[in-house]
Design a protein with these regions (language model features):
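Short catalytic micro-motifs in class I SAM-dependent methyltransferases
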Residues: 134-135
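Class I SAM-dependent methyltransferase SAM/SAH-binding core
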Residues: 47-124, 129, 144
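A short glycine-rich, Lys/Arg-flanked "PGG" loop and its adjoining helix->strand segment in the class I
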Residues: 143-158
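Class I SAM-dependent methyltransferase Rossmann-like catalytic core
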Residues: 1-58
C-alpha cells in the first residue's frame, strides 16, 4: 500500500486561480446575475437531483456561491425556503458580491418570511446539506477541503458537490 497522495492541482496555481476575479453576468434574458454558464448548468442539474433526497435541511451552506452558481442559489432557496442558509466565500470581494446579489432589501416581504441568509462559515456539525458546485478541482488540497466539509455536516447531513476530474 502506498502512502503517496493522489495528484492534485499545484498550490501556487490554486492560489492564482482563487485570486482571479470571476465575471458575473446578467442571467438569461437579462434576468438575475449568473455565474459562469457551465457552472450554472451543472448546478441546475444537481438541484434537480435533490428531488430524490427526502431529508429537508433545516440549515445548509453554499460554498463559494459566486463561482458555483448564483442562479442555482436562488433555486436552492426556493426549494428550502424555511431553512437557514450560510454563504461561504474565500475572498472579501466575492463575499461582498454574494451579499450584493443574494441579500434582499430590508423592505422586501421575502426577507420577513424566509430565514435570513448568513454570510459566514457555519458552526461545526450544524448542516444538513452542504452545496459546493465546481469547487473541489480549484483547491490546493482537496482532501483537507472534504475533511473540513465533513466537520460542518450534522449526523445524517449530506454533501452535494461537483468538480472536474
Amino acid at each position: 500500500m502506498t502512502h503517496e497522495l493522489p495528484p492534485t492541482i499545484d498550490p501556487v496555481a490554486a492560489a492564482r486561480w482563487a485570486a482571479l476575479s470571476m465575471p458575473v453576468s446578467a442571467g438569461p434574458s437579462g434576468g438575475a446575475p449568473a455565474s459562469a454558464w457551465l457552472h450554472e448548468e451543472v448546478a441546475r442539474r444537481m438541484e434537480e437531483r435533490l428531488a430524490w433526497i427526502k431529508l429537508r435541511p433545516q440549515q445548509w451552506a453554499h460554498w463559494e456561491a459566486v463561482r458555483g452558481g448564483l442562479q442555482a442559489h436562488k433555486l436552492l432557496a426556493q426549494r428550502y425556503p424555511d431553512a437557514r442558509c450560510f454563504v461561504v466565500e474565500s475572498s472579501p470581494g466575492r463575499l461582498q458580491r454574494a451579499r450584493d446579489v443574494l441579500s434582499k432589501p430590508w423592505w422586501h416581504p421575502g426577507r420577513w418570511k424566509a430565514a435570513p441568509t448568513r454570510f459566514e462559515a457555519p458552526p461545526e456539525g450544524s448542516l444538513q446539506m452542504l452545496w459546493a458546485n465546481m469547487l473541489l478541482h480549484q483547491v490546493a488540497d482537496p482532501q483537507a477541503m472534504i475533511a473540513h466539509w465533513h466537520r460542518t455536516l450534522a449526523v445524517d447531513g449530506f454533501l452535494m458537490f461537483s468538480c472536474f476530474g
